[in-house]
UniProtKB/Swiss-Prot annotation:
Broad enzyme group: transferase
One GO location term (cellular component): cytosol
HAMAP family to which the protein is assigned, alphabetical: TrmFO
Protein name (Swiss-Prot/TrEMBL): Methylenetetrahydrofolate--tRNA-(uracil-5-)-methyltransferase TrmFO
GO MF terms, alphabetically ordered: flavin adenine dinucleotide binding; tRNA (uracil(54)-C5)-methyltransferase activity, 5,10-methylenetetrahydrofolate-dependent
Task performed by this protein: Catalyzes the folate-dependent formation of 5-methyl-uridine at position 54 (M-5-U54) in all tRNAs.
UniProt record, GO biological process: tRNA methylation; tRNA wobble uridine modification
Catalytic activity entry: uridine(54) in tRNA + (6R)-5,10-methylene-5,6,7,8-tetrahydrofolate + NADH + H(+) = 5-methyluridine(54) in tRNA + (6S)-5,6,7,8-tetrahydrofolate + NAD(+); uridine(54) in tRNA + (6R)-5,10-methylene-5,6,7,8-tetrahydrofolate + NADPH + H(+) = 5-methyluridine(54) in tRNA + (6S)-5,6,7,8-tetrahydrofolate + NADP(+)
Keywords: Cytoplasm, FAD, Flavoprotein, Methyltransferase, NAD, NADP, Transferase, tRNA processing
InterPro entries associated with the record: FAD/NAD-bd_sf (IPR036188), MnmG-rel (IPR002218), MnmG-rel_CS (IPR020595), MnmG_N (IPR040131), TrmFO (IPR004417)
Amino acid sequence: MTEKVTVIGAGLAGSEAAWQLAKRGIKVDLYEMRPKKMTPAHESGNFAELVCTNSMRSNQLSNAVGLLKEEMRQMDSLIMQAADACQVPAGGALAVDRELFSKYVTDKLTSLPEVIIHDEEITDLPSEGITVIATGPLTSDSLAEKIQDFEGAESLHFFDAAAPIIAADSIDMDIVYKKSRYDRGEAAYLNCPMTKEEYDRFANALVHAETAEIHGFENSEVFEGCMPIEVMAARGAKTLLFGPLKPVGLENPKDGKTPYAVVQLRQDNAAASMYNIVGFQTHLKYGEQKRVFQMIPGLENARFVRYGKMHRNTYMASPEVLKASYEAKKRPGLFFAGQMTGVEGYVESAGSGLVAGINAAREALGQETVEFPVTTALGSMAHYITTTDAKHFQPMNASFALIPGLEGKKIRNKRERHEKISERGLADLAAFKAEKLDD
């Protein structure tokens, strides 16, 4: 009889792992402590809740996360099914209605006869049986302690932040204009133009605004890919102009000129009744967010549906603990997945859950676990988190820097080179799937 598998945590990674197990006919006990016990970042008990942005970043094969998405589609990913079904306009990126997305994943998993849902907290590592731990960077204290004991090393951490969401009907449409950068795709973003004087006033107010107190917070522990806007602004007067307020490619159609700075708003739900402020992750006090962000042209009367907030994320010393199959080195049958392993980002977390779920299924079926080719985005992430020097281990997004370069004559055009790497990765994935997985 095939062994049942326990999956702890129904976030992006745990949901994907449960799906990969169930579609292979494996019975799954899926545990999720929410909504009975909430985390500092979550707001519901739904599966795969998106706690930060609603964007899953680029859909292009010239971008590593675009390659990762396509690989996951080829592997019948539940998270990619949901994202494609619930997308909202975002130019060349893939953004979703966060509530519809989470509902899609929840409905799919609760409808599967192979998956039994348990609304309860797990406070210890199961002593036996095949298990996937995917409790995320906000793992409850009791379980986090047990994981740390298992690791035999102190877990690492960084601080992550979310951007505010504002009501669409509170945006001054006479001031903002609709456009995607360089006119890629449809005009999907609302753009708030700033003059130099407006930018200088805003940047000065931002740097001097009062932040919320967070125990143990230090700027050095901020993840670069999700840096609070006020931390970025403090690095230099013009830093924001090369980051989230970059005006290049966003000419204002009202006068044909490129503003000095531009704040972008991205649609947050299918009804287009909410927008998030792109790149404005923050840990300012709520009152300060209202005061400072209402200085942005077009947002003078903005109504905040959700204020930005920050939380501490914990991750494992994976190079010392895991194999590239996401299985623990010292305990066969115990897998870890998601941001807690050191992959960073929604899609990356789901991707790790996909690999862990496939390998947990193989273990349950009496088959050998597999490691995905390092020429794929899925394989390169697993390779990175398990082979990097543990002393310098940091969370990492999908990146072409993790994937071996092309052989032969170097392609000078970066976009073309990246597309060729993606073509090779997808071909290698297809061959790997046919040889190793289609059995």
